[in-house]
Every structure is written in C-alpha cells, then in structure tokens.
Amino acid sequence: MNFMKRAGFVLTCATMLANLCAAQNTERTPQGMKCTTQGMDIRVEFYSPSIVRVYKTPEGKPYNKESLVVVKSPETVKVDFSEEAGQTVLKSSILKVLVNPATGGISFHTIAGNELLKDKDYGTSFADKNDAGTPSYQVRGSFLLDKDEPIYGVGQVMDGKFNRRNSMHHMQNENMFTYSPYFMSPVKGYAVYWDNYSISEFMDTPQELAFQSLGHCADYYFMYGGNADGIIAQVRDLTGHSPMLPLWTYGFFQSKERYHTQEESLNVLKKYRELQIPIDCMIQDWRYWPEYQKTDSAWNSHSFDPERFPNPKKWADEIHKLNAKLMIVAWPGFGTHTEQRKELNAKGMIINFDTWPPQSGARPYDVYNPEARDIYWKYLNKGIFSYIGNDGWWLDSTEPDHINRQESDYDLPTHLGSYRSVKNAYSLMHNNGIASHQKALSKDKRVVILTRSGFIGQQRYGCNTWSSDVTSTWDMLEKQIPAALNYTLMGIPNWNSDIGGFFAGRWNQEGGAKNPKYQELYVRWMQFGTFCPMMRSHGTELPREIWNFGKRGEWCFDAQEKMINLRYRLLPYIYSTSWDVSHNDG
C-alpha cells in the first residue's frame, strides 16, 4: 500500500513538473500564444474573434510562409489569457481555445464551453522528405470529431456521396475531381482549412480525421460560424469575397464541341432569335486558332484561323448586335510553334510535361511565376480581349491535363518549388492571372470566367467552375448533386455542369438527339441545370441546340423551351440571391 502511495506521489510530481516546464515554455503573443513541445514550435493566433490560425514547424526550423489562398490580415482581437488544469486558455468574444503545452493538443470550444473540435494530442508529425532534391517534410495533422458528426466539403468528388465521414481521398486535382483540404461541420458550426497546395491525402476513420501533405509546416485555420451560412461567411472573410457577376451570366448559354466557323456560331444564335427562345451567351470552344496540317503545333495560340474565322472582330460585333455575349476558350498549354511557347520556354517558364492534346508536344506554362502570368495575358489580351472584345473566358484544363505521365514529372521545378508541392493550386493561380490582369486593364467589363478546376479562394476571381467532362448517363447526373453541394460548401458559390453530359456518343447508334431515352436524360439534366448558378448546354459527339431534339409542339423541344423560359422568369430571384452572396456572403 505504501509502495502504491509512493508511486502515485512520484507520478503526480512528475506530471506537475512536466506541466510546469511546459508552462514556462509558453509565451503570450498579442493575438495568442506560442510554445515549443514534442519537437515542434507551435503558434496559435486569432485572425478574428471567430477565426484561429494554428501554425506548427519542426523545432528550431522557422518557415516564413506566404499563403496563396488566405487574403485576410489578422484583426486586432482582444484575447484573454489564463491557465486551466495545466493548459493555456485563450478566449475571444466568440471562441475559447485550450492549448496543452505538454502534448501539443489543441481544443476549440464555444465561449459557453461546448467543445467543437480537438487537434489531437501528439497528433502532428513531421517526417523528413526529399522533395526533388530539396529537404522537406511529410506533414500529418490529426483531429478528433464526434462519432456521428457529419462533415462536408473536401471538394468536387464524383463518387455520389455527400457526407465525407469514413472516407479516404487522394487529393490530386484532375478532370472531374477538384479537391481542397477543407471540411465543415454545419451541425457544430465550424470548418477547418488546411493551407497546403501539394498532392495530399485526406483520411477519416473511426480513430481520427487526418490531412497528410508535403510541406515545411502544418498550417490550418479554424473558423466558427454557428451554422452553414455563418461558416461560409467566415471562409470568404478569410479567403476572399465572391464578386457580383453580370445579369447576363444567369441567362442561357449555348455551346458545343465545337463551332468550326464564325458563320456556324453566328447562325446558331440567329436561329435562337428567330425561334424567340431566350439566350444570353454563345461559347466558342477550341481550335478557332490556325490548324497547321492538323498537327496542333499552333495549339492555344490566342489567334484566329484566317479561313474559318476571317473577321473575328466582326463576328463578335454581330453577336453583340443580336443582344448576346461571347465567351471564348483558352488553355494553359501551348503548341510548339506558338509565340507564347517560344518566349516562355526561353525564360524557363514552361513545365516540361505533356498536356492536351496527345502527340502535340504541347506544354503548360509555369502559372506560379508572376512574370509568366504577365506573358500569358500579354498574348491573350492582344490576340483576343482588346481585339474582338469578348465578354467572358472559358479556361479549360486548369488542373492542367497531364498525359503520358511519369512520377518524375512531379519533380519538375516551378517558381514556387516542385510541381508536386503546389500542383493543386494551378487553377487558382491561372484564374488569378486572367482576372487580375483584366481588372487592371478594363473597368467596363466585370471578370467572368468558366473554369474546369478550382481551389478554395477561387471565388474571388469571378469564377464559375463546371464539373468537367462527365459522361452522359443517369448515374453521372445523380453524382452531380452531391459533388456540387460539397464544392459550393467550400465557399465557392458558382458551379455548373454540361447539360446532358459531355460524352454522349453512346446515344448516336439509336438516333442521337432524337433517341427518346437520351431525350429524357437531357431534359432531366436541363431541369437540374435550370436551378444551377449557370445554365449551359454543352457536349461532344452529338449537337445540343434545341432544334436537334425536334420542333415546337414535340415534347422534348417544348420541355426545354419551358425550362429556359422558367430560368428567365426566375431572374429577379436569382439576381437578388447573387447580390446576397456577394454583399452578405450568403
């Protein structure tokens, strides 16, 4: 008995000594605190009364990180500082944060004391990693959630699931899969954004939720909003507000892969006007540029084929005279004979892997380099924007496409490090380049971008993400709904899909657009698209203009016309909601 008492006394003393040493290693800062424990330097800082940044680095190895996503500067927040049961307690007017300086664990609570989330004791690790010859780390951060707590976010994932509990995701942005290391818990009213752009892993198991990434630090933001709307307001406060888009962007868009000539595009618009069916925008897909013996050496040259588009300025003007807008596609990769490729290559601003189209030799530019973004815009502006006066951009393949892929491709250098370390932010930076340059040049047109990929924060660039090249099936239509919801719950409000699905060739053997089975799918997809932020008909392998499905008086034509007209009757509601999203972060 005496032995047990002595052992208990020794254990108690040891615990008290450990806590005392930890407390002595804790330093208060103006917005929070910092400490060193478990081989890590930890800094906890309030960015606002409801946003907390947690920043961890290996002990004695500080890293000055500049975020590509976070635009908010820390507010001056009154933080109360105290000790409670060996833990450091930080309080704002909204949140209470407990930091265990012995274990590195951090728990987040409402000011009333209700626990929201726990950054796990001993849950952060740094394992040495060679990143293309540069010393780095495999960083892992682990969190504890309630057993039955649902979470959402993570990105656009085509798996048909909404709740992201008990799932694992290899977070690498590709066609149809658009990830961001973020999740929200609307039931408890909080969200976490893990500020990392590398190819990463998301893992939620009964034991823990974890992010695992390549990097020099564990850097995340805890946001409390009370409910889903409140959370999204916090996300936009941190990563940028969504600008209000023009009224015309909420009308009907017609597109296909592709209109081969300026006359074909213009005639489609004229026919819609003759039928008195509302339409606001025509979209021009790829290969309007010169085609040299079909080799794609002029791929994405930001110029027009003189035979098929002999007078692009007149073409754009005619579209405008018909009271419609013009959106035109641009890609991040360049063919071998383009002036952009030559200039960027001479300056070491090409990422040397194969991108679309196959066997073309096209390569993507180093979007992480601000000078490369300047060069990209220089040609885009001269060849298209200031020349024909288009109204919007369709930025395709913004992941970007990666074909003939080799593992060594991810070691390729960019302006900000290895491609592997920043890959998932490619779309964010590409859209940044277009939006910021257009805004600097022109105050007359708001930036409007349709883009195939995305990352949290991209909402600030006037972007509308579409779900990529999805197949024309009922199963894929069903998957659009949870994919859209999880994507927009990251604070990115504008999302859409190709009405009818992009790849529709399977229906050609049975009549194509006249096939009753395809017509039913297309009409159902259009009904879904009517209530999406952008209503856009697009696809390949069979035409999608309304008259290809029949004529007025036939059910498929009439059903589409009914939905298009409904869209326009809803415009007062849609535009008012757009204002709420922009002005109130609704």
Where are the predicted features?
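Catalytic and substrate-binding clefts that recognize carbohydrates or anionic sugar/phosphate headgroups
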Residues: 83-246, 256-257, 262-263, 269-274
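Short, acidic/polar
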Residues: 261-271, 373-382
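Glycine-rich, histidine-containing beta strand-loop boundary motifs that form or position
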Residues: 46, 56, 92, 99-101, ...
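A low-complexity, Ser/Thr/Gly/Pro-enriched, surface-exposed linker/loop concept
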Residues: 30, 45-88, 126-128
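Glycan-recognition and catalytic regions of carbohydrate-active enzymes
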Residues: 164, 543-546, 550-586
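Bacterial Sec-dependent N-terminal signal peptides
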Residues: 1-25
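Conserved structural-core and active-site-/substrate-pathway-adjacent residues in large, well-folded domains
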Residues: 44, 94, 182-183, 272, ...
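Aromatic- and carboxylate-enriched substrate-binding clefts and catalytic-loop regions
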Residues: 278-560
